[in-house]
Amino acid sequence: MRKPIIAGNWKMNMNPTQTTEFVNAIKANLPKFDQTESVIGAPAVDLPALLEAAKGTDLKVAAENCYFEEAGAFTGETSPKTLNEMGVDYVIIGHSERRDYFHETDEDINKKAHAIFKNNMTPIFCCGESLETREAGKAEEWVSNQVTEGLKGLSADQVSSMVIAYEPIWAIGTGKTASADQAQEICAVVRQTVAKLYDQTVADKVRIQYGGSVKPANVKEIMGKEDIDGGLVGGASMEPASFLDLVHFND
């Protein structure tokens, strides 16, 4: 049985004071860790405040990005080694905004996955197609290829433990949501791709999230689908009441 995982992705929002206030507002009401995993992904400048406020709670912490080298002359980048030393649990990689605005390639993202595992953290690996790709009937092929490239060289144990987030680009921040059936269809393709690359045991263990305008009103239906184990949530994760509604989708 795969444990549900609801992760907020704050993108470039919130400051350290707001971060502390947010965690203080939710920490007494989080679901038990053995029921649902609650995660917040925050900008690098907020991570110390988030880690401090989350101490002793069931809240896990994600960085929104890191570099694939541990140290060196890489101005402006974040070291995976340092993130691990700080106590970060997850790192989001391959988000469409990183691929699109910052021209990250499949190879870059694969190197990051290796660096994250090397430093004892877990990647939340994002994949997803554009509206153009979907309308051309190539969504399944596109996403399967992203997963294939992103997992290159990773062991079966590593893939079993990671999180893959399917985020159709046309549904991120647009108010458009893939229907629960559309989301399930591609999440099933992700799982089938993992089964082909590794085996069914690995595919049955990997947790797959759907991301793209997930909110309290639709989370229960989305989470009811066979191959969807969680949500990667933007806007709806930035209000304490809304985030609590999301992590308590099962109540």
Curated annotation (Swiss-Prot):
Enzyme class: isomerase
GO cellular component, one term: cytosol
Keywords recorded for this protein, A-Z: Cytoplasm, Gluconeogenesis, Glycolysis, Isomerase
Gene Ontology biological process terms in this record: gluconeogenesis; glyceraldehyde-3-phosphate biosynthetic process; glycerol catabolic process; glycolytic process
Localization annotation: Cytoplasm
Catalytically driven reaction(s): D-glyceraldehyde 3-phosphate = dihydroxyacetone phosphate
Pathway: Carbohydrate biosynthesis; gluconeogenesis; Carbohydrate degradation; glycolysis; D-glyceraldehyde 3-phosphate from glycerone phosphate: step 1/1
Main location group: cytoplasm
Active-site residues per Swiss-Prot or TrEMBL entry: 95, 167
UniProt keyword Isomerase present: yes
The EC number(s) this enzyme carries: 5.3.1.1
Pfam families cross-referenced by the UniProt entry: TIM
Highest taxon listed in the record's lineage: Bacteria
GO MF entries: triose-phosphate isomerase activity
SUPFAM superfamilies, A to Z: Triosephosphate isomerase (TIM)
Annotated substrate binding sites: 9-11, 173, 213, 234-235
Biological role: Involved in the gluconeogenesis. Catalyzes stereospecifically the conversion of dihydroxyacetone phosphate (DHAP) to D-glyceraldehyde-3-phosphate (G3P).
Family that this chain belongs to: Belongs to the triosephosphate isomerase family.
Subunit record text: Homodimer.
PANTHER family in alphabetical order: TRIOSEPHOSPHATE ISOMERASE (PTHR21139:SF42)
Record protein name field: Triosephosphate isomerase
Organism the protein comes from: Latilactobacillus sakei subsp. sakei (strain 23K)
